[in-house]
Amino acid sequence: MSKLTTGSFSIEDLESVQITINNIVGAAKEAAEEKAKELGPMGPTAMAGLASYRSWNLLLLDRYEPVLTPMCDQCCYCTYGPCDLSGNKRGACGIDMAGQTGREFFLRVITGTACHAAHGRHLLDHVIEVFGEDLPLNLGESNVLTPNVTICTGLSPKTLGECRAPMEYVEEQLTQLLATIHAGQESAEIDYDSKALFSGSLDHVGMEVSDIAQVSAYDFPKADPEAPLIEIGMGSIDKSKPLIVAIGHNVAGVTYIMDYMEENNLTDKMEIAGLCCTAFDMTRYKEADRRAPYAKIVGSLAKELKVIRSGMPDVIVVDEQCVRGDVLSESMKLKIPVIASNEKIMMGLPDRTDADVDSIVEEIKSGAIPGCVMLDYDKLGELIPKIAEVMAPIRDAEGITAIPTDEEFKVYIDKCVKCGECMLACPEELDIPEALEYAAKGSYEYLEALHDVCIGCRRCEQVCKKEIPILNVLEKAAQKSISEEKGWVRSGRGQASDAEIRAEGLNLVMGTTPGIIAIIGCPNYPAGTKDVYNIAEEFLKRNYLVVVSGCSAMDIGMYKDDDGKTLYERYPGTFSGGGLLNTGSCVSNAHITGAAEKVAGIFAQRTLAGNLAEVADYTLNRVGACGLAWGAYSQKAASIGTGCNIYGIPAVLGPHSSKYRRALIAKTYEEDKWKVFDARDGSEMNIPPAPEFLLTTAETWQEALPMMAKACIRPSDNNMGRSIKLTHWMELSKKYLGVEPEDWWKFVRNEADLPLAKREELLKRLEAEQGWEIDWKRKKIISGPKIKFDVSAQPTNLKRLCKEA
């Protein structure tokens, strides 16, 4: 008897009876395993489970020891508690502070992973329903389409339908991971860290499925370095037109709105703009042929409340992720209808999915309902523009805005009693009382300066005893700068092409391109948006390859040089040294890890399928890269960063990120931790302490710069590469911290490693300060370095990769 597989069949001899079998239990997995056999070489961890990467994870965690920063001394997780875990005490269940802190961090990571995976599931199911499961994956000039999927599952999907198996794999593993959170399950902090790293790898699978599905189905730019430039900023909005604002991360519903606008010639009659990652993806829609874009980006998550308070939107449509919990309540104050288009965020609104569009418009126009849930995307596409057309003249006639008049502004300023409660409540510790004091004397520039630094959380307003609407006051003071707030950002180009990887791979591995700097994440910056611009510009000037995504990519586009050009206009969008490559929205972060993985797979010919440890070992030892999530706030940021860490890619976070409760920092003075194998013969070899962390925080962007440059040093750097990297690290430290690093000499293997412009000076210092023997006639180092340079050395942490093994 032939085996049953997925699909359907009918028994024709039975009258009026049809039996349809949608799925055979186990058939999908069997089919996936059969498919995997077609892929060729396979590593040892295809379809990895909770324990599959444990040996690799523990190897990482042995060098990069977890540094725990608990938020409090109690555990309130079950009804035995709350339990005091201070002073090495254990809770009633037996867990200690380390275990509880590990569990808390792990919970954040799997929450972020689940968020991206659920996004991917919703999007994948929808595009399969609309475009069919046989739609080919088209990501541009690439054969390695899904490096993260292939590494974790062994699969290499070529169609939308084939993406189901990796999606099901992620969902199954997430269920297993979530189970370990339950009381009476895992209690060892080190194993929570291992599971967190595994969850991070799953996150990049979920993100990858999400983005490849939408790039293929929605005709996004496909590995396109010339993806269109998009207007960004509140000053880019034409206030004479009705304004639709989309907020969230899942663009599926918004594409229907854009289709309706195009079919009904509305693109020049109304504005459509976005906040957060939906904004990026709506500007990528149908842009593969580089048509003139009309969708705009208002800004990042930090702009949500500011945009609502401005009164500019005539209707807001929300989907999922990074949507403020007060969007509806704040919008209701200003008669801005809110339409929820995704089951994950319904805001208590009435469901009108089955109602007639015109009847919904009438309900909203009359004020009978403040908005509704609309899950039928065909109706959503028609509903949103119709609401905007109806509400715009009504709201314009009433002049609705939360921004105070000149008279109200003065009254609010004079009400301040300088109690300082607002400053204490502010996550950024902004000196609001001082700014109000200056404003009372007629100097408004201090208030205006707070506009950019303010993250728009309104915590200050809730503690103000005088009930001053502080956010509105800040926005009033900054009206001129807001009206001029206009920049350019390159639309998300998707992944790096195989050809780009081949061309740039050698430079990255040898170190002649100093490194990949990935600037990603949320806008919870410690001192305003210009920090990420400053960091990006500094590294671009030094020929680093800068990759950006999400809110950080938006904020980088808000600043211009003296010639009025943004970084996106000044630097090419190519995957090469000195390139500024915007991959797109949050889910496109998978293409950043994917690029490092493709260097291993394409340039170094490493097997990707089911082979995470070997690929990660390669990136840790050979691919200079460092991530920056300077404003990280969400659980998704934790999972994205942890997914980078399992691949040996370090990440620097902003000062708020100590609240994630865990860092991974090595002890550079423990020399035994800095030994690896030489794959040529299995012998031990010393390596420099680089990277010296996998996850850490910095207090200022000036501190972050040299940290990131140092984190791009790799054991495999050739002399020219090491010299270039040392030059940048030492110069950045001197420029921004006022001192050269104390440990620069640890990275010198011979005189050719030294920065060329300072070689003689540094040789003198090595002789005087470190006691190294120098042949001054030949200007060569005779003795001193503990690390010997061998151009053919093959550093690896995996004994099984050594030839003797």
UniProtKB/Swiss-Prot annotation:
Positions with a binding annotation for [Ni-4Fe-4S] cluster: H249, C277, C322, C522, C551, C586
Cofactor note: Binds 7 [4Fe-4S] clusters per heterotetramer.
Keyword Metal-binding: yes
Keyword Glycoprotein in annotation: no
Residues the entry annotates as binding [4Fe-4S] cluster 4: C426, C454, C457, C460
Key words of the record: 4Fe-4S, Iron, Iron-sulfur, Metal-binding, Methanogenesis, Nickel, Oxidoreductase, Repeat
Annotated [4Fe-4S] cluster 1 binding sites: C72, C76
UniProt-annotated binding residues for CO: H116
Enzymatic class: oxidoreductase
This enzyme's EC code(s): 1.2.7.4
Annotated positions binding [4Fe-4S] cluster 2: C75, C78, C83, C93
Cofactor(s), by name: [4Fe-4S] cluster; [Ni-4Fe-4S] cluster
GO molecular function: 4 iron, 4 sulfur cluster binding; anaerobic carbon-monoxide dehydrogenase activity; hydroxylamine reductase activity; iron ion binding; nickel cation binding; peroxidase activity
GO BP term, example: acetyl-CoA metabolic process
Reaction(s) catalysed (UniProt annotation): CO + 2 oxidized [2Fe-2S]-[ferredoxin] + H2O = 2 reduced [2Fe-2S]-[ferredoxin] + CO2 + 2 H(+)
Residues annotated as binding [4Fe-4S] cluster 3: C416, C419, C422, C464
Taxonomy, superkingdom: Archaea
Pathway field: One-carbon metabolism; methanogenesis from acetate
Biological role stated in the UniProt entry: Part of the ACDS complex that catalyzes the reversible cleavage of acetyl-CoA, allowing growth on acetate as sole source of carbon and energy. The alpha-epsilon subcomponent functions as a carbon monoxide dehydrogenase.
Record remark: domains: Cluster B is an all-cysteinyl-liganded 4Fe-4S cluster; cluster C is a mixed Ni-Fe-S cluster which is the active site of CO oxidation. Cluster D is also an all-cysteinyl-liganded 4Fe-4S cluster that bridges the two subunits of the CODH dimer. Contains two additional 4Fe-4S clusters, dubbed E and F, that probably transport electrons from ferredoxin to the B cluster.
Quaternary structure (record): Heterotetramer of two alpha and two epsilon subunits. The ACDS complex is made up of alpha, epsilon, beta, gamma and delta subunits with a probable stoichiometry of (alpha(2)epsilon(2))(4)-beta(8)-(gamma(1)delta(1))(8).
Family: Belongs to the Ni-containing carbon monoxide dehydrogenase family.
Name of protein: Acetyl-CoA decarbonylase/synthase complex subunit alpha 3
